[in-house]
Amino acid sequence: MHNIHRRHFLKAAGAVTAGLVTANIALNANASSVAPKPRVGKSVIGLIAPKMELVRVGFIGVGERGFSHVEQFCHLEGVELKAICDTHQAVIDRAVEHIVNQNRPKPAVYTGNDLSYRELLNRDDIDIVIISTPWEWHAPMAIDTMESGKHAFVEVPLALTVEECWQLVDTAERTQKNCMMMENVNYGREELMVLNMVRQGVFGELLHGEAAYIHELRWQMKEIDHKTGSWRTYWHTKRNGNLYPTHGLGPISQYMNINRGDRFDYLTSMSSPALGRTLYAKREFPADHERNQLKYINGDMSTSLIKTVKGRTIMVQHDTTTPRPYSRHNLIQGTNGVFAGFPNRIAVEHGGFGKSYHEWDMDMQKWYDKYDHPLWQRIGKEAEINGGHGGMDFVMLWRMVYCLRNGEALDQDVYDGAAWSVVNILSEQSLNNRSNSVNFPDFTRGAWKHATPLGIVGA
């Protein structure tokens, strides 16, 4: 989306969001204490769309993230890239050129204003839409996509308010269309191996998980006129909480079968002082630069604790400001042992190749040899060649297309996207109420109690 439009929309969205948050806290800090609205359709847990011989794809947003999806789809069989939409001509031209250079038909192009995507949605030769736009557009575009009779696949996070989460759930249930937040980290090799190990009982009964998005991104503040930093920077002036919870939380949630036998119950959150971006702006920009006029309020480190209905605990952290190595934690603790990421290491009481659980086993190869996930065994080499965050992007898109072409349910649904994304809002609500706990809405309306647990997905 064009930067001028982004800024205007973001300012308006920020004002609305601030009002909604204030109202929510004033009226009721516990977001789920009010009973959910009656379901207007039927649950989409396990939704299976009619088989598609070819998956016809439209793209809304082909900038940095969107273009990477265009690249990956060009590697996939059984897909047609029908149309693209963006408000920035340079990224449109790049995407069209790449598609044509891959010996695929030239896609239709939609541009001109922020609502041009609706022209793309009016087409009757598109099955799914890939949405890779600034965060504030995710929910509105996904809702419009489902209303147009198409399946929505949305970049993270899925939504920015509790009400948006409910609107997405209600629309998916009423239209019986998929709305999948594309949490690519769930398809990383390590994450899928751990899922396999969890399902085989290697760690025993699960007790605790730790998730994070710790990724120093201050350099994005220098992206002024376009690219991610041109709009993402402003969120650090709008909210104080976990702005981006899903990369770490998605895999932990699937290990624990959240929304499929357990669910998030309540959350408490704290944030550190917000110092790093102000200091960075003073160091890297002239005194009169806009970046030095902004008031950064989002704490450099956000830490939330989640309690599940079954009593399990999850720590979720967010830090894109301080100078430190990248981490998503990816820790899962059970009664028989633990896996922790960054760096990968394992300690188990029984079944640990003779190594004591009092010390970490850092040699992953023997664990891969025994527990490497079926998806990576099948397409891992192809994923590594095609890239995309170490191959996880390719595996995710391959799996999406496989499910659609073979009449299988997707691995992530609208309830997952809503539950993982709503941590953004609830962490802010808790923080603004002296870190008192805030209840999670039950977006499944009780269906989590009887939903089939996610298995060791394969192909």
From Swiss-Prot:
PROSITE patterns found in the cross-reference section: TAT (PS51318)
Pfam families, A to Z: GFO_IDH_MocA (PF01408), Glyco_hydro_109_C (PF21252), TAT_signal (PF10518)
Family matches, as Gene3D superfamilies: Dihydrodipicolinate Reductase, domain 2, NAD(P)-binding Rossmann-like Domain
Taxonomic superkingdom: Bacteria
EC number: 3.2.1.-
Cofactor names: NAD(+)
Post-translational modification as stated in the protein's UniProt record: Predicted to be exported by the Tat system. The position of the signal peptide cleavage has not been experimentally proven.
InterPro entries per record: Gfo/Idh/MocA-like_OxRdtase_N, Gfo/Idh/MocA_oxidrdct_glycsds, Glyco_hydro_109_C, NAD(P)-bd_dom_sf, TAT_signal, TAT_signal_bac_arc
GO molecular function, one term: nucleotide binding
Binding positions for NAD(+) per the UniProt entry: E64, R65, D86, W135, E136, W137, H138, E155, V156, N184, Y244
Keywords on record: Glycosidase, Hydrolase, NAD, Signal
Enzyme class: hydrolase
Sites where the protein binds substrate: Y213, R232, Y244, P245, T246, H247, Y326
Signal sequence interval, chain numbering: 1-31
Cofactor note (record): Binds 1 NAD(+) per subunit. The NAD(+) cannot dissociate.
Function: Glycosidase.
UniProt record similarity statement: Belongs to the Gfo/Idh/MocA family. Glycosyl hydrolase 109 subfamily.
The protein's name in its UniProt record: Glycosyl hydrolase family 109 protein 1
